């Protein structure tokens, strides 16, 4: 049975993520990390979901039962876990979060000792241990060999210092008015501190988590409130994070939501202008707009494509010796400062770009026009191979003949089919999307 999805393990708390399941997974992961253990320490952080307490305690019980010492640091962004795992010399890091999903869901993401998400072969190795009853039950420690757990509440300072070091030393934010939407999630403490200490005039919204309101009509998936607040406050910029703050949505001074591909393009060129790129390659996923590739080419930069998911972006960056890349959804990686997508690092770089451009953000962040794209997330009841659906191949052939770029795939974390179409003719795009929706609703819903 496959346990891992595209971004760790995710499911409804108490249904898939039961205490017994989490303990078993914790033991399996711990035994895998033990093979290369250097310090016998594992770091655990979480977002603000109520079920995080249950998942955290199950993991602590599992890991200490096989002899690991556990450090618990409470609510922190996912990229903070990646950074602190390496910074605190831990064998591994664990983030308890379902990212942008509703509060009823939760998830578990693993990081190696260098702060990188696990490769697929590493996840498969953990799955094999998970299903090995004999190994699991013979691994418990007794007496002095049992591990210990301790909670450290002040590591947030390390991460704040790290974030501030990512911001250009010759700049400050004193001339910017910024609205932050922390999604009642993991960034609710750290984001206001960082921007305030760098001098910005800050308004914070959705920073009162109660365990059940994470991502609720707020944050990166619902930026309309942020857009209204930016206009009302007459702010220069607005930043919306998702529940675990590895993702960023930007709103300009006019209240417009900045498309993720425009962000990738303008940030890539900004990094080039500072001689901060390690190569001429910038990495994006197969969902990226063709206009991004054309814009980067005009700036003597090459776009490299990869599969969807920030761990695939990270891997492609390493293969191409690139230090910048991301997804149009807002997972953007500056690998000089973060091993995974970091919404706060990205927000600081966007702020620096706007400052140095000496333009309002609605101009500075609008470097090119996009080709029309239509993205639909369709709820499905089953996930058979798409190639097995009668008429599917003929549909794709027709799209190719009409020069409509297409990307159709199941979500790795939800029961959804994602359909992306791109073409120069917007009316044709809408017509074909309706046809596709009706086709898949008839087969999958």
From Swiss-Prot:
PANTHER family: PHOSPHOGLUCOMUTASE (ALPHA-D-GLUCOSE-1,6-BISPHOSPHATE-DEPENDENT), PHOSPHOHEXOSE MUTASE
Keyword Isomerase recorded: yes
NCBIfam families documented for this protein: glmM (TIGR01455)
Pfam families, A to Z: PGM_PMM_I, PGM_PMM_II, PGM_PMM_III, PGM_PMM_IV
Taxonomic superkingdom: Bacteria
UniProt xrefs under PROSITE patterns: PGM_PMM (PS00710)
Alphabetical keyword list: Isomerase, Magnesium, Metal-binding, Phosphoprotein
PTM summary: Activated by phosphorylation.
Name of the featured protein: Phosphoglucosamine mutase
One GO CC annotation: cytosol
Phosphoprotein found in the keyword field: yes
């Amino acid at each position: 049975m496959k346990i891992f999805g595209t971004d760790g393990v995710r499911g409804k708390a108490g249904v898939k993520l039961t205490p017994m399941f989490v303990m078993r997974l914790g033991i399996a992961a711990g035994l895998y990390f033990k093979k290369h253990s250097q310090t016998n320490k594992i770091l655990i952080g979480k977002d603000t979901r109520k079920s995080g307490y249950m998942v955290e305690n199950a993991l602590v019980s599992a890991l200490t039962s096989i002899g690991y010492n556990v450090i618990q640091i409470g609510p922190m962004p996912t990229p903070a876990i990646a950074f602190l795992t390496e910074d605190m010399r831990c064998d591994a890091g664990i983030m308890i979060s379902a990212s942008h999903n509703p509060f009823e869901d939760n998830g578990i993401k693993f990081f190696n000792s260098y702060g990188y998400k696990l490769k697929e072969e590493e996840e498969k190795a953990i799955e094999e241990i998970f299903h090995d009853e004999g190994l699991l039950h013979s691994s418990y420690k007794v007496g002095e060999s049992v591990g210990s757990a301790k909670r450290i509440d002040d590591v947030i300072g390390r991460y704040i210092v790290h974030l501030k070091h990512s911001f250009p030393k010759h700049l400050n934010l004193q001339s910017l008015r910024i609205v932050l939407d922390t999604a009642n999630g993991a960034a609710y403490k750290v984001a206001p501190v960082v921007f305030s200490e760098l001098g910005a005039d800050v308004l914070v919204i959705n920073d009162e988590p109660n365990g059940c309101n994470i991502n609720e009509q707020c944050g990166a998936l619902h930026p309309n409130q942020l857009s209204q607040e930016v206009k009302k406050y007459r702010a220069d910029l607005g930043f919306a994070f998702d529940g675990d703050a590895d993702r960023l949505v930007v709103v300009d001074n006019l209240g417009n939501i900045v498309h993720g591909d425009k962000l990738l393009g303008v940030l890539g060129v900004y990094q080039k202008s500072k001689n901060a790129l390690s190569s001429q390659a910038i990495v994006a996923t197969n969902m990226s707009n063709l206009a991004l590739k054309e814009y980067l080419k005009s700036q003597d930069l090459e776009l490299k494509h990869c599969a969807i998911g920030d761990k695939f972006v990270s891997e492609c960056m390493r293969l191409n010796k690139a230090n910048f890349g991301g997804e149009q959804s807002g997972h953007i990686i500056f690998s000089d400062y973060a091993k995974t997508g970091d919404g706060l690092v990205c927000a600081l770089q966007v702020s620096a770009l706007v400052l140095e451009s000496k333009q309002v953000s609605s101009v500075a962040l609008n470097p090119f026009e996009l080709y029309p794209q239509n993205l639909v997330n369709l709820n499905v009841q089953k996930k058979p191979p798409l190639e097995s659906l009668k008429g599917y191949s003929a549909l794709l052939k027709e799209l190719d003949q009409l020069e409509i770029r297409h990307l159709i795939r199941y979500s790795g974390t939800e029961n959804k089919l994602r359909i992306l179409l791109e073409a120069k003719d917007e009316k044709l795009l809408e017509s074909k999307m309706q046809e596709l929706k009706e086709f898949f609703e008839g087969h999958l819903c």
